[in-house]
Swiss-Prot record:
Subcellular location: Secreted
KW Disulfide bond (keyword) present: yes
Domain of life, source organism: Eukaryota
Organism, scientific name: Conus textile (Cloth-of-gold cone)
Protein name: Omega-conotoxin-like TeAr94
Family label: Belongs to the conotoxin O1 superfamily.
Pfam families documented for this protein: Conotoxin
GO cellular component: extracellular region; host cell presynaptic membrane
UniProt KW keywords: Cleavage on pair of basic residues, Disulfide bond, Knottin, Neurotoxin, Presynaptic neurotoxin, Secreted, Signal, Toxin
Propeptide intervals in chain numbering: 23-50
Length: 76
């Protein structure tokens, strides 16, 4: 009986601890999404959705041009 009560208290404590530590990270999540979406509406050229990348086999200069991120004279 005591072990069961201790287990229940431990689970409740860990659940509460999870919620307490998660609040600062999730409280601004919607606000950050709104600000990012608002910025992308004001600057559509800077939107991540407009970024182009090269398919494999296409010549490249740097890895950030390739969709895979790997560039050795051609996108891998």
């Amino acid at each position: 009986m005591k072990l069961t009560c201790m287990m229940i208290v431990a689970v409740l404590f860990l659940t509460a601890w999870t919620f307490v530590t998660a609040v600062p990270h999730s409280s601004n999540a919607l606000e950050n999404l709104y600000l990012k979406a608002h910025h992308e509406m004001n600057n559509p050229e800077d939107s991540e959705l407009n970024k182009r990348c090269y398919d494999s086999g296409t010549s490249c200069n740097t890895g950030n041009q390739c969709c895979s991120g790997w560039c050795i004279f051609v996108c891998l």
